[in-house]
Amino acid sequence: MTQKNTLLLIDGYGFVFRAYYAQQPLTSPKGEPVGALYGFASMLLKLLSDFKPKHVAVVFDSGGKNFRHHIYPEYKANRPPPPEDLVVQLPLVRDVASNLNFPILEKNGYEADDIIATFAAKTAALGEDVVVISSDKDLLQLMGENIKIYDPLKGKYITEDDVVKKFGTTSDKLREVMALIGDRSDNIPGVPSIGPKTASSLITQFGSVENIFNSLEQVSSLKQRETLQNSKEAALISWQLIGLDSNVDLDFQLNNLEWSPPNSDKLTGFLQEYGFKSLYKRAENLFDIKINDHKEIVENKVTEAKEISNASELADFAKKAEKIGIFGIYLLQHKGDNVALILSLQNQSYIIKISNTSHDLFSYNTKNNNDWFSDIIFNLLTDKSIRKITYSLKPLLKFYAEQSHEITAIEDLELMQYALSAGLSQKNLFEEALKEDNRHLSKPAYREEFKGDTEALATAAYKSVREDASTGSTSKLPLETKFGKMSNVINESARIVAEFTSLYKQNILELKDNKAFRLYSNIDLPICFILDKMEKIGIKVDANYLNQLSAEFGAEILKLEEEIFALSGTKFNIGSPKQLGEILFEKMQLPFGKASAKASSYSTGAEILEKLSEHGYNIADLLLRWRQLTKLKNTYTDSLPKQIDNITHRVHTTFLQTSTTTGRLSSQEPNLQNVPIRSSEGNKIRQAFIAEEGYKLISADYSQIELRILSHIANIDALKQAFINKDDIHTQTACQIFNLQKHELTSEHRRKAKAINFGIIYGISAFGLAKQLNVSNGEASEYIKKYFAEYKGVQEYMEQTKAFASSNGYVINFFGRKCFVPLIHDKKLKQFAERAAINAPIQGTNADIIKIAMINLDQEIEKNNLKTRLVLQIHDELLFEVPEDEVELVTPIIKKIMENSTNMDVPIITEIRVGNNWMEIH
């Protein structure tokens, strides 16, 4: 597609609008919307890569009125204003073009189309080629011998055949046809009832719009003739509006549009300012320049990585590290497999390839095939006088399983980034390295490398790599093959690790400038060690009980299926929404059948089934029960026994520290924070989580913690007083909402009040509350009004928080943690983002309170040399496994520490329960 002597004319705003609607919402490091800017920059880079033009220009509308508005004041009057989050980006689009060194063309009073037409015509007159980059149909009028139109959406040049197929005429007659058709998007009237087929037929017969009106008597259809006669003025105006002005008074100097690579420093600053890290590699390759990942990395040039392959070489590294006092270290893993240990000193990186590839949690130790390096590295990691800089600390802690608690003076760049900008789209520092490797593992290249081997080996190896492309797993490959295939990702990772020290210095400065250093050093970093310990300990699960429960669920599922088939009169795949919809709404002719927006199949979600149930259709109850049991069976009773470790005979979850916007922890593989609690079946599953013999489980659960936090941060006197007086807050709310005395309340009143109390925290709407309480929208709205009247200050807090989030792009919790709300300017998702903003300071404060409690409890347990161990964190709750002879000792310690983790205007209350399994303590 190379066009070395071609002028490329780019429809600027056409690109920007396409980019906005094609791109997921993105925000800059400052929380500003930049999705359209990112998409625009990405498109421009692609054009440079594809076309390699000698001359190029991005052409913009100047805005405001132009000559077409004088002809027809209603021109484009029907267009709605662009979305708010796009409006704030529009003034910056020229910066995108100029930072990529694109010449810009625009002129007051003219649209981009006219400027494109002018430059295209003048360039073509010189015998030079022109390519217009646009999806705008109006520009198809320009097509000619030296002028081509390239549609970036379709990724192809538009041909005359394409124009004829769509409009029924050639490009030179397009203006005539479109004048008759009109253009709704631009509010160009055209002639009523005349579409492309009729218009092209008339132009074929008469040659032009003018000729039609000069020969109206020759129009055979009386109806068409009358329509044309009545619309003559509109048609002639449309002809003027659609035509392009190719004589705009502009200084035409083709040499002024010659493109050259952008200034490296200028481009680096631009990409960093807007957070466009994913464009770094493309820009580097395209412009043959170096873009530093952070502004401060200019101290030393990163040199090619060196491999350390024996203890003597590593000992030399250790001596240098001791002398310098700081080094980088990163354990490169792909899907749990250890691939390489990467070290760095003063921007020089070193690679140690790891032969032990097992991803069994308990295979990591210092007595394996990696003996020659593990002890030397461990001595460095435990040396208090040497600072270690890593990224994603936990894999390194697991590598030194039993001794990980001895590791000291280590910093985690990932946790630093999170403390600075929780909620923003965080990209793994090594993401580009993984992308490079995934490109390297493309199918043709892979097969070529295995040329000469059996087809079976190539196929198996290719399959194993591609199935896990996002993580680059190579666990099924021979070692020599693994290191060969991983060479790209190892080398690219080494380049990044070489910059760890510089990154650390920059992050420390930013943390201190943003008052986030205490969050990182006092909460985020120490909790990482505790989570690692919890993951290694795991929790005991009764596999035999789960197997029995699975069989019990399975038997009921089979019975439900028989009843469903009997009621429907046929067998079908109940798990297929498409088949289920056809059975319910076509075969059985049940009401409420509604096709989903994105597919031709019927909606069969819980809302529809519950509605059918309310109207007495028994099959809906059976289906809801079937779904409940199959989900529990698949998610828990079938899968949990398979996740029990063969060595520890316990289940080991993984806690994620940086996956939420609020600082809240999450759990995966398996997710043990989501085990159901509100149903009898959910409680049966909790019964499977048991204490070891001679131990008890202790649950320590914060009581109504989020309401207590709300009362403090929003300064709600009525709420604070209720908590200080130890009143039942749900009972108090019920009395106010329903105008009843305490003795008149029922459990249903309290249940509704509880839903209102907690719903308000999440910014629930009247519609949402009505649905939850099964009341009318009017009733729900009245409940909310009464709530705001009783608890004065809550509504003000909500409005102030939304306004702060809108102005700053983030909210702040009690401890000063910034919780970014990147969608706050997204028109479609604004309400969702506002609800998130209201809740984030509360949920984020809760998350930090319980993390502080975990840290303090861990210290107390260590200090007293107790065998008590923390095994799970479930948001408001901590689960301990405690020796029976420590229960009486440790229970008051847990309660005291949890209730004194922070100072607020209201007491923090912890409820303690002791039992043999998780069900007993709930």
From Swiss-Prot:
UniProt-listed CDD domains: DNA_pol_A_pol_I_C, H3TH_53EXO, PIN_53EXO
Please list the GO biological process terms of this entry.
DNA-templated DNA replication; double-strand break repair
Asked if the keyword Cytoplasm belongs to this entry, the reply reads: no
SMART domains assigned to the protein according to its UniProt record, in alphabetical order: 53EXOc, HhH2, POLAc
Task: Report the InterPro entries cross-referenced here.
Answer: 5-3_exonucl_a-hlix_arch_N, 5-3_exonuclease, 5-3_exonuclease_C_sf, DNA-dir_DNA_pol_A_CS, DNA-dir_DNA_pol_A_palm_dom, DNA/RNA_pol_sf, DNA_polI_H3TH, DNA_polymerase_1
Q: Which reaction does it catalyse?
A: DNA(n) + a 2'-deoxyribonucleoside 5'-triphosphate = DNA(n+1) + diphosphate
Q: Which GO terms describe its molecular function?
A: 5'-3' exonuclease activity; DNA binding; DNA-directed DNA polymerase activity
Which residues does the UniProt record annotate as the domain RPE1 insert?
Answer: 439-487
Specify the enzyme's EC class, one word.
Answer: transferase
PROSITE patterns reported for this sequence: DNA_POLYMERASE_A (PS00447)
Q: Which residues form the 5'-3' exonuclease domain?
A: 1-283
Query: What keywords is this UniProt entry annotated with?
Result: DNA damage, DNA repair, DNA replication, DNA-binding, DNA-directed DNA polymerase, Exonuclease, Hydrolase, Nuclease, Nucleotidyltransferase, Transferase
Identify the EC number(s): 2.7.7.7
Q: Which family does it belong to?
A: Belongs to the DNA polymerase type-A family.
Q: How does it assemble?
A: Single-chain monomer with multiple functions.
Summarizing the function annotation, the protein's role is: In addition to polymerase activity, this DNA polymerase exhibits 5'-3' exonuclease activity.
Q: What is this protein called?
A: DNA polymerase I
Q: Which organism is it from?
A: Rickettsia felis (strain ATCC VR-1525 / URRWXCal2)
